[in-house]
């Protein structure tokens, strides 16, 4: 995790939004660790809207509409699912403090979810933070094949439709790179972020 890290003795929702506006985001070492630290990567993960790529097979799956897609329907369930340990994710950085903070951001209209439902069962989803014309993706989970990927496709469609200019993924992963995510140097990211913060806060 290249970049600067600094511990924070206490974070309020307003401080959290201010941090996002200047390029910082919080993490914990583990779900059981009460400490939170700020992260500012040297290379920032960004998913450019004009280079967003969906494979033919995934596009075909999306068209079949295997799940009901909902927005902002079950925030606490989504972040709880993202915090769960799984075989592919034995540890998580989402602790109780982070869950509480983002739940408050949801109540304030700054945190949002995209959810995949199969009947009455939540089977995939993602959450993130909106500020200005930027959306900061935080975490995702999947309990069915392609569920989180389909949520990402719907997220990008939604952000494009609403006029967002920046989709920040924090870091890039091989998974996100298949969608077109790139690493952006800190200085270039700062310019992109400044432009997004000059925008009025967009409706998600």
UniProtKB/Swiss-Prot annotation:
Q: Name one GO molecular function term.
A: leucyl-tRNA--protein transferase activity
Q: Does the keyword Transferase apply?
A: yes
UniProt record, GO biological process: protein catabolic process
The answer on whether this UniProt entry bears the keyword Acyltransferase reads yes
- Superkingdom to which the source organism belongs: Bacteria
Q: Where in the cell is it found?
A: Cytoplasm
One Pfam family linked to the record:
Leu_Phe_trans
Q: Which GO terms describe its cellular component?
A: cytoplasm
Q: Which family does it belong to?
A: Belongs to the L/F-transferase family.
- Function field: Functions in the N-end rule pathway of protein degradation where it conjugates Leu, Phe and, less efficiently, Met from aminoacyl-tRNAs to the N-termini of proteins containing an N-terminal arginine or lysine.
**Cited NCBIfam families:** aat
What is this protein's record name? Leucyl/phenylalanyl-tRNA--protein transferase
Specify the taxonomic lineage: Bacteria, Pseudomonadati, Pseudomonadota, Alphaproteobacteria, Hyphomicrobiales
